[in-house]
């Protein structure tokens, strides 16, 4: 199974949720430097089956061959392990990627390797409204026009909204330090959210915006929704 979507849409959270629903199943997680140990990890999974092998950011080892010089031995290791699962082996591969467009065709399209792909899209308006409520925590979110805030965040991810509220709280605390005590919820208004949004959309924060999953629509939010 392949989970794909831009950064910040919740792929890692989804993996954790799925694994939490599988009691008694061995989980082998490959991420970062551990990606170099594909064969060893799969051997452990076969020994301790039923098992799930989670390969995070699989695009790091499975990019199109044309993007790299020479062959990718890690890619071949992964393909060999996925091909080598017989009907008597209870091992499932769960892959995640931010860049499905870069995946090796042999990995993404051949039946038996990845037989189900699920996109985690950016949240729609209703989901963004729920995320505002979820991430406000103990903040006193005093918004005069919540619908405008939701409209102005079209195209962003859950991570973006979480960071937006964090920065808005900092703006509010800087504005009135006396109101930012540990026992008093910080009051965040439309003005604070707008100021935080301007920070995130600043051209000098382009990398931060990308990492948080700020979509194309955010480019126009500095001046409000198009009309």
Kindly give the residue locations of the regions a language model identified:
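C-terminal alpha-helical "lid" subdomain
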Residues: 125-227
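Conserved Walker B
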Residues: 57-59
């Amino acid at each position: 199974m392949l989970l794909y979507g831009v950064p910040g849409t919740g792929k890692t959270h989804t993996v954790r949720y799925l694994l939490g629903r599988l009691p008694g199943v061995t989980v082998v997680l490959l991420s970062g430097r551990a990606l170099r140990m594909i064969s060893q990890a799969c051997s452990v999974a076969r020994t301790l089956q039923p098992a799930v092998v989670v390969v995070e950011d699989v695009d790091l080892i499975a990019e199109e061959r044309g993007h790299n010089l020479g062959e990718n031995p890690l890619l071949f290791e992964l393909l060999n392990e996925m091909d080598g699962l017989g009907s008597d082996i209870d091992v499932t591969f769960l892959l995640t990627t931010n860049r499905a467009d870069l995946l090796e065709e042999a990995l993404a399209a051949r039946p038996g390797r990845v037989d189900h792909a699920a996109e985690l899209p950016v949240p729609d308006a209703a989901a963004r409204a729920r995320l505002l409520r979820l991430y406000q925590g103990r903040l006193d979110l005093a918004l005069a026009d919540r619908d405008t805030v939701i409209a102005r965040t079209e195209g962003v991810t859950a991570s973006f909204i979480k960071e937006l509220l964090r920065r808005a709280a900092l703006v509010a605390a800087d504005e009135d330090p006396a109101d930012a005590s540990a026992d008093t919820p910080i009051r965040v208004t439309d003005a604070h959210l707008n100021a935080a949004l301007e920070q995130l959309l600043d051209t000098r924060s382009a990398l931060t915006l990308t990492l948080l999953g700020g979509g194309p629509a955010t480019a126009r939010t500095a001046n409000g929704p198009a009309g």
